[in-house]
Amino acid sequence: MGRRNSYFPGNFVPLFFVFIVLILQQERVICQEDRSLDNPAANRLYNQFVFDKISNLTEVFEDDIKRELGFCITNVKEDYNEAFNFSTKPDFLNACGKTTKGDMMQRICTAAEVRIYFNGLLGGAKRATNYLKPNKNCNLSSWMSGCEPGWACRTAKDVKVDLKDDKNVPVRTQQCAPCCAGFFCPRGITCMIPCPLGAYCPEANLNRTTGLCDPYHYQLPSGQPNHTCGGADIWADIGSSSEVFCSAGSFCPSTIDKLPCTKGHYCRTGSTAELNCFKLATCNPRSTNQNITAYGIMLFAGLGFLLIILYNCSDQVLATRERRQAKSREKAVQSVRDSQSREKWKSAKDIAKKHATELQQSFSRTFSRRKSMKQPDLMRGLSQAKPGSDAALPPMLGSSSDTKKGKKKEKNKLTEMLHDIEQNPEDPEGFNLEIGDKNIKKHAPKGKALHTQSQMFRYAYGQIEKEKAMQEQNKNLTFSGVISMANDIDIRKRPMIEVAFKDLSITLKGKNKHLMRCVTGKLSPGRVSAVMGPSGAGKTTFLTALTGKAPGCIMTGMILVNGKVESIQSYKKIIGFVPQDDIVHGNLTVEENLWFSARCRLPADLPKPEKVLVVERVIESLGLQHVRDSLVGTVEKRGISGGQRKRVNVGLEMVMEPSLLILDEPTSGLDSSSSQLLLRALRREALEGVNICMVVHQPSYTLFRMFDDLILLAKGGLICYQGPVKKVEEYFSSLGIVVPERVNPPDYYIDILEGILKPSTSSGVTYKQLPVRWMLHNGYPVPMDMLKSIEGMASSASGENSAHGGSAHGSVVGDDGTSFAGEFWQDVKANVEIKKDNLQNNFSSSGDLSEREVPGVYQQYRYFLGRLGKQRLREARTLAVDYLILLLAGICLGTLAKVSDETFGAMGYTYTVIAVSLLCKITALRSFSLDKLHYWRESRAGMSSLAYFLAKDTVDHFNTIVKPLVYLSMFYFFNNPRSTVTDNYVVLICLVYCVTGIAYTLAILFEPGPAQLWSVLLPVVLTLIATSTNDNKIVDSISELCYTRWALEAFVVSNAQRYKGVWLITRCGSLMENGYNIKHFPRCLVFLTLTGILSRCAAFFCMVTFQKK
């Protein structure tokens, strides 16, 4: 319903026609003489007859009221009873009958006269100039005393009045007299209309000082000295007829009685009864409202106390849990070490006893030659064993029949041993896991057999110690040796991935620039390959091409996976990519970061003890034991060191046990020792068959020698060398490029490729010729342009631009004479192609060939929930500040924006919508703005975007429920509107849910700065549109789509429903002026909720569509 400037519609008459007729429709069947009215029995019969007529006629006009006034009348019978049910106090009817000497019914207005009155209100007539449309009784030629305000006349005795007649005005000119108390007589008609409940309509008294008829605002007509003050003259909205409303601080049980409010009670304007105050509220005599500020203060103190506890104790909860885990872990480690020490000591004693027995037997057998030759060998084996390693363990004496019999009696199940150790920690029996035992798989525990955390830690550390012992025995272990070791100690084998690339070229679309050209080689499993080259050589582009993505580029050539032309994306579940930036959650500990990645990316059917082993192995190999329980830290809150953070960044990919691991400059910013520690961990992964490729910048010689293969790139993405590190110096020496003594070879080669150093003239080669020499050396086909113009080769190719991880080098398109406009157009086309390819990559899908089943959406959703719960607890201080701001906003708005009865508190609710929308949007931006890089990395790794989004939204539902309560606890108790707390709370929940979804979309689409500006601008602008009073169809149409409009309507309607009786006209006028409907309260909540759902769908679509992979 659109807005209108007037308060009342043209068809407003039927409502009041019903109200009047329902009371006044009677047959003149009762004696109208004064003595009949003095009879109590007759009075009861008279009242009973009136109310029977009312109940019968209600159904007749119910359809008309619903059709014409449905926007402000919810239940016709209920609203009628609230306004005109005088059954409890009918005294004013009997009093009027006595005053009019029995002709009251001939003074009551018909439907036609009621129509004249309300049509006058429609025309804008107010109290000061209340001239109604001329009619049969009051016009320019006939103006009697009954036409004056507060007066009425009667019809002739022989005239039968039809109160239902809404077309003909009866002649009513006889015996004009003041209006009865409890009725009002408008100026311009000569009849009476009953005042509604909640009104106070006594007979007026002349105030000789002001000349007004108190308590009303009309004056006596001039030139009529015998005219006196009558009754009430108007009933309209409170702004036009406030004098007939029962005043605040008093209550009116009937329209002729007004009583002051007693102590302990309060009475609002238009009250028919006094209301009890709450226990802690202060209500003095004549209180207009109860002072419930004490409840607000108590609630404020309670919430403040809880927030302080949350503020100070949130970290302690997680810290206590971490300490308990650390104790369990340390206990497991110590138990494993003690068990191994006991086993070694027991083995040594058994060997000593056996040798002593054999020595004694040798003496008794006169030094048998065979015994004398066997003893030194056994003693030598004992003396050579190291006390700190498993080398001291005895060999398995499988040939001994006694040993075979003993094995059958022994308990070899690790689970039983673990239970024994837990129950009997001092028992000398411990882990009986001997290195070299070929049957160790039979003794190893199954994942389902280990239940407690202590058991899993002991199992993990036992395996790690065995692996350390095996590596100590085989320091120069090869890949084939690892396979053999894996068979011995049950290391799970990983699928192998070999990546071969042949004549690979990458050209930037729109500009035709070569980012890489004629790249041929391969990456083998079990080897660590280093990619080196000067800045702009295309190192990051090369890594991007390996992952099967080159947005905005044309990629030619072949990439073979295990000798087949397949998409590398089909293996993304077993491919790890470590970005150059350390994208790690700063508000999680080192262990929590690693565990989350392991849970989401390891096989779903992998037992938890095996996952514990994987995580503990990575922590051990990366040297992160001492900081495992430390927060990684952020820019604002310092955590672990930069080198440790870099290792955690690598560990996120190692814990998923990849088959292909790609790292972009993992050693940048690390010192030599940290780099060696990281590379040793990577070499251990390579020994398990992992194909590792990493970009490095000028490594030290020690680090350089730890690589297996080297890929050396020149500017323009051309290969100068690809092969074993051990043969790189030999190859360049064959070209006449010899590394001087005491010079690091990689530094020397990169300086030559950069052009800083020039090869000796005797070599007869320049740095621009090195890529061609490599092609010729290996017999690769060389493009004709490179053969003909070696000098211009470098300038014809470009390096990486900013979109590919580097800066552009080489020639620029504008150098060949292209105009500025042409160059600009090429840049635009290139950017469009990049965006287009990104969108295609986001929605493209390839088959899964990794043969790894990771946890599903629901399981990942649970993992995300757990992670977000920890993050929210650690961000409790930020959350406490948000709540305190909401509390202050509620206090300020509740104090300053008092509820206005004329507008049903619309102004205060307008401020509420703006404040709550703004504050909740800004805080909701943090859900996605701060984690964009983390989401992009996790999504690229194959984690579920739906699980991520739903978990974020689920955790934010805590704020959706609590924040309205925090704000309302202050606003409601300081403002105290008539609507219930429940209604306001439900509206605020729907509002917060709606604006949170909008904030998600803004956070995903924009950077944090612009997103905050939009969050501030939208609530203000949309609220202005929703409250605009201009008769503009376009604005009205836009307003219908604004969430602020539905929130305001819900607030106002919930409040307007509490205004009944004398407030009926005010309610209908205010709702019509704003275009609200009293029945739209559920509809408003549905629209707010639907807006929140649709905005979340839009946010999820934008998150998936515009992510950067």
Swiss-Prot record:
Record-annotated disulphide pairs: none
Region (Disordered): 325-411
Ranges of compositional bias, category Basic and acidic residues: 339-357
Binding site for ATP: G533, P534, S535, G536, A537, G538, K539, T540
Identification of the protein by name: ABC transporter G family member 28
Domain ABC transporter as annotated: residue spans: 499-741
GO molecular function, a single term: ABC-type transporter activity
PANTHER family in the record: ABC TRANSPORTER G FAMILY MEMBER 28 (PTHR48041:SF91)
UniProt gene name: ABCG28
Membrane association type: Multi-pass membrane protein
Stretches that traverse the bilayer: 5-25, 291-311, 879-899, 904-924, 954-974, 986-1006, 1008-1028, 1084-1104
